[in-house]
């Protein structure tokens, strides 16, 4: 047995499923998950000594690559001053100043410890600010594991939501309406059914949890207009897209103004950080100056703030996003060319430093239904064959891939060459 196999066997006796987040267990592709010893730049190194070109990037945070010296040094320096104080620090102020400068729609920001905390807190704030209970989310979008978000659509577009996990009470789920991503008609129908009850829409501006599905041109502006028409707030979940699709996020890339924004992943530089913020009048409803409660023992802790501050300063440097786009575009085009040579039907969506690989005969993939029609079994084989070639892709047909500026054009070309060999056998 490999060392990864031995560790996985031991882990399953101690940790549910052997992992601390389900997708890591390789249940979407089968087989034994890699146990990682270290990472540097664009590469992961497993406990058995094999190196992989990494397109998971810790599920998004590693936009600069692994073990970036500026972030590493910032963490070391902060740790020498203490790990956590439970009191305000200067770095929290500097971090808030930087975030609100980089994302102009955020007048104020509150730091938390994860993307899930950010989204659930933003929704609570929207409900408290509007005095309404219902929310709209979209099929195939993921906003963390808060109870109100682990909800699937009922039997029709206007039926009440149903829990999609045991442990979520039906009384919670009934306040969540699930509409179709990229379908404004379904959203309007929900508002017309409940015109005075919907507090907010929460949306991934690029859906990254049904692989990578960008918005149609009219979708995000249409959501903004519907929120304005019916007095609801628009929450854009930029946990995945923030500082990646563009420096000011997908909201800047697609020119839409939210009321609240949720951030995570890159904002922590690899440390556990989330944030939410937006309009000053809305944020003023948050405790301790307003009635909507939110708190966290480790929120804004000095180590995480130091890592995030260093990361964002590097991400804000000229050329970063142009490099991400160039590398991702080359990868997408190369994969399509290699698939076409082998007669493999393939769609590759990409925007900024995100991409998605779909085995499908369709000309495009724009919604959850399109994603579910793709050939998952072929993806599983592709994943394992690419892994054997030393390329680590997301171990699920429903997760986006992530580029970093640490990837070289040689890494990209080697990945395309590996895919060409795999497609020939697929």
From Swiss-Prot:
What are the annotated GO cellular component locations? cytoplasm
Q: Does the keyword tRNA processing apply?
A: no
Domain of life, per UniProt, equals: Bacteria
Uppermost EC category: isomerase
Q: Which PROSITE patterns match?
A: AA_TRANSFER_CLASS_3
Recorded GO terms, molecular function? Answer: glutamate-1-semialdehyde 2,1-aminomutase activity; pyridoxal phosphate binding; transaminase activity
Matching entries from CDD domains are given as: OAT_like
Cofactors needed by this protein, per the record, are: pyridoxal 5'-phosphate
Q: What is its EC number?
A: 5.4.3.8
User: Which reaction(s) does its UniProt entry say it catalyses?
Assistant: (S)-4-amino-5-oxopentanoate = 5-aminolevulinate
Look up the record and name the pathway of this protein.
Answer: Porphyrin-containing compound metabolism; protoporphyrin-IX biosynthesis; 5-aminolevulinate from L-glutamyl-tRNA(Glu): step 2/2
Classify the main location. cytoplasm
Annotated positions of the N6-(pyridoxal phosphate)lysine modification: 265
Q: How does it assemble?
A: Homodimer.
Per its record, how is this protein called by name? Answer: Glutamate-1-semialdehyde 2,1-aminomutase
Q: Which organism is it from?
A: Escherichia fergusonii (strain ATCC 35469 / DSM 13698 / CCUG 18766 / IAM 14443 / JCM 21226 / LMG 7866 / NBRC 102419 / NCTC 12128 / CDC 0568-73)
- The protein's gene is named hemL
